[in-house]
Amino acid sequence: MDAVIAPRHEDCRDAERRAEPLPANAPLSMPVQSLLQSPQAAAVRSPAAWRRALIMVATAVLSAAGIYEMYQVLQVGGITVLEGVVLVLFAALFAWVALSFVSALAGFTVLCCGWRDDVGIMPDGSMPAVSSKIAMLLPTYNEDAPVVFARLQATRQSVDETGRGAQFDWFVLSDSTDPSVWIDEERCYAELAATHDRLYYRHRPYNTARKSGNIADWVERFGGAYDFMVILDADSVMTGDVLVRIAAAMETNSDVGLIQTLPVVVQARTLFARVQQFAGSIYGPMIAAGTAWWHGSESNYWGHNAIIRVSAFAGSAGLPTLAGRKPFGGEILSHDFVEAALMRRGGWRIHLAPTLRGSYEECPPSLLDFAARDRRWCQGNLQHGKLLTARGLHWVSRLHFLTGIGAYLTAPMWLAFLVAGILISLQAQFVRPEYFPKDFSLFPIWPAQDPVRAAWVFAGTMGLLILPKLLALLLVLIRSQTRRRFGGGLRTFGGVLLETMISALTAPVMMVFQSTAVIEILLGRDAGWQVQHRGDGAIPLREVVRRYALPTALGATMAVGAWLVSWPLLLWMTPVIVGLLLAIPVALLTTRVSRSRPLLMTTPEQIDPPAILAQVHALADRLRPANQTTDPLSALCSDRRLRELHLAALAFHPPRRRGRIDPHLATARVLIDDAESYSEAAGWLGPREIRAVLGDRETLQRLLKLSGEHAQLAVGSEPSG
């Protein structure tokens, strides 16, 4: 189906006749939930109890075996203090690896035996009927507007092709603070609304509570009119097939509050993004199937590409503000985990649908961009430590919090483990051992380890890390259709080797970045809310050197320290040291954009691109004018329909509260009143003043009056809502 947008010459009044900027209010109460009291909720019976017992027992047995072997390595001459530290760190890290391995093994098994969805979704069955009213919500914050709207429109066209489009309404919920982005969003909305009804746009003047507050604001204003809502990210694309199927599953299962799909990374252009794309495509389904199998009705929510029962969300997921100062207090950052836990506490089932195809997202183009996003997630996940003791949570929900915290604490733990290992070697090499301590002892203390057993422990640990990759590869190779979708068995095998090599090089650097993030958070540094970079990944050389100086210096220090101790220690630490020493060249290599189709690490979406992704590109090109101005005020002055739409949309902004003064708006009013011309006033206004002017109808009209030819039109424009 061709991408369709409004003709550029069509007046905005025609668009307003087809679709109001916002629908009529349908308020729905969303009370803040208490963490100190457990609500009364119906019990949820899950068939996953025996599955969880199996997973936990297998993890415990595997962990005990690994820890015992490590103890045997260290106890040859008695456990010293440093060896005790190493043993404790190893126990925690090995248990983490063991749980991941057992869960992946479960995923391999259930996919081999044939996955059966707990909510009855049939990926290849006939298209089900849907009678419920569904809202598609796209929260956005300072993103590239033409691309964001193109993704939404491509998703909409795919839904319309199923014949179920009448059940869906479409909302763009903007929290953008950049004036140019704000006006560009309105321009794109006007283009699409001219030919498509049930498309709505709302801009919040104050982005209270960030994304979670954006969704909560919509629920409280419009949620009463809808049965379900689908949350998208700015980089999300979903096919109509998957949307209709998860909506039908929600109708069939009245006690299900949320179904999370498995988003597949697409549109990767840099080598780093391609590694993430390939890894997610080949390993992701098996890992997700394993977690879905034993999480059951206590699965998790990842914040996007998921369908939610609006009444359940409103009644159970109102987020409280955490006591204390940032970064651990204040607004809950990683809200998705918490919302899922609260909904499950409220008696609603939370499910993951790992086998549905047609749910897509994109990946940061570079390791630095990935680390910047990871920094926010790290703070949000560590914040969950305050929620572990919340009353009434299911133990699996608490486990989600623990695993989220552990995902970041394991980085400094691995680093501490490496440092402790070096110190033990230094102690053995340079410190004269005290064979006979001051206290009475019948036997001397020999600082010694068992090198042969240590090698076996290392090999076993590496096996647990690598074997899931091989199992996922095996799943592809034994299925002829899947093998062809990845480009053939040989290319897939080569892709796994290349992905493993690049991941091994970047993992030590990510360990340093995550360790730094944890330390910063513990020192009280807040991550803020930065714009997600989704470009081509190009980073200036000076910035690369500056940002990767710490990992490189750490690698050099480790290399020198290990070399001074012994060659065997240096060889033992080579995988980590090489990754750190090559941090800068690997960073430059992995941010390069490849224009040609790659030979290795290809995914099904690259071999046979879905039509919906091609539509995104076509729509984005049509929504982006060739001579677009970046000045939002000039855009309003030169475009009558855009000006009318903006003034109409301001009618939906909440009125200013008496006694609350916006200093930027007050400054703008003084500057505008003092100016003798539009160009003079516009030149005096800074970005914050421009944003304040754009959000105040009266002040904006005073500025437009100065533009002469637009004066009467600007003043005479009335909101159509």
UniProtKB/Swiss-Prot annotation:
Primary residence: membrane
The protein's annotated pathway: Glycan metabolism; osmoregulated periplasmic glucan (OPG) biosynthesis
Species per Swiss-Prot/TrEMBL record: Rhodopseudomonas palustris (strain TIE-1)
Cross-referenced Pfam families: Glyco_trans_2_3
Membrane topology, record value: Multi-pass membrane protein
SUPFAM superfamilies given in the database record: Nucleotide-diphospho-sugar transferases
Annotated gene: opgH
InterPro entries: Glucans_biosynth_gluTrFase_H, Glyco_trans_2-like, Glycosyltr_2/OpgH_subfam, Nucleotide-diphossugar_trans
Protein name as it appears in the record: Glucans biosynthesis glucosyltransferase H
